[in-house]
Amino acid sequence: MKKIELLAPAGTMEKMKMTLLYGADAVYLAGKVFGLRAYGGNFTKEEMKEAVRYAHGMGKKVYVTVNIIPRNEDLEGLDDYLRYLEEIHVDAALISDLGVFSLAREVAPTLPIHVSTQASAANWRTVKVWKEMGAERVVLAREVSVKEMADIRKKVDIELEVFGHGAMCISWSGRCLLSNFFTHGKRQSNRGECIQACRFKYSVMEESRPGQYWPIEEDEHGTYIFNSKDLCMIDHIPELIEGGASSLKIEGRMKSVYYVAAVVAAYRKAIDTYYAERGAYRVREEWREELEKVSHRPYTTAFAFQEADHTAQEYVKSQPEQPYDFVGLILPAEEGTTRVQQRNHFRVGETLEYLTPKGDVGLFTVGPLTNGEGEAVDRAPHPLEVLTMQTEMKLPAYTILRRRAKHG
């Protein structure tokens, strides 16, 4: 059995490198154009080329999103862009639009194509057609259940990618017009400019049904009827693998370095444990605990085992919980030296928690600090400042330092 791929988001070069170091098999990213995350940082052409070189050097893959639903004016330069992706040997382009798909086949015939979830592939006949047109993989609509995925895989011999973790959209496969409505067309979600309107605070009243109430009218704080919980499938790795998924996708190109690294580390352990133990596999509580330490809304399995109903929505608040602060990042250093880049204030003598690229977690005490001028300091208040730290514990490069948030 071919091992399921762990696919992670890469909004920036730093995030890409961290997700690969923390165990992702592949990353998906976007260029400055033609993607659905216009505000996710994204990559210049040269950065994409470097990303491919870096990932391939680790034996890993890079997929580039070309998944906008384009208008006529969006097509300008698309042919050259697709040729460039082919030229730098990206491992696949993620495409949702039929016209873009056709153009890619025409101008970049050796460029592998994965059909984006925005294409809303929800049945085996649709998947079969995409395969016949030349797609190597289909990212199933998020609304497809595990059972439906298994049925599709039995009928069509093609790679299937499924979302396993991250924020969910209230719209069918992300096809939403709320951003267009609230900005009078100035921000268009299907062209990469989503304003997260589904997370706004709303109050809803239906005047023609007196005496009939919905949970959205529970209290004076309004409602978040559009505000989905976050997807979490950490408890269901066997079902995804045995159901025929080729790739498990983590959402979050606009999330922090800490978020993507920690989530990848948890799913890396779960996937590897499944293949090592098979019939004896069991979910570890520490995996769940790790996912509780990143910014998240309450978790749900959404459509995986039933049609999503009111329980898949979060009615209390729109902002995710942020239980831990990302405090610092251990940088490469000479033997016997520990260098740390500040990401949040910390001080000498403080107890912090660490998360290594292998997913190991533990506590340590911050030792004496020296700043870039060689001066001893008792705290690290400056953003991104690099300090030398004395510590008896040897922490590997790119270890994350964190602490429980005071509000968490």
Question: PLM features: residue spans?
Answer:
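Gly/Gly-Pro- and Ser/Thr-rich, intrinsically disordered tail segments characteristic of DNA damage-repair
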Residues: 76, 115-124
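Surface-exposed amphipathic alpha-helical tracts and adjacent flexible/coil segments at the periphery
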Residues: 1-21, 26-33, 52, 58-68, ...
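Alpha-helix capping/helix-boundary segments
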Residues: 99-100, 168
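Glycine-rich, positively charged N-terminal anion/phosphate-binding segment
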Residues: 37-54
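Short active-site loop/helix that positions an aromatic residue
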Residues: 102-105
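Short beta->alpha linker loops
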Residues: 11, 96-99, 122, 144
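Conserved phosphotransfer cores of two-component systems
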Residues: 108
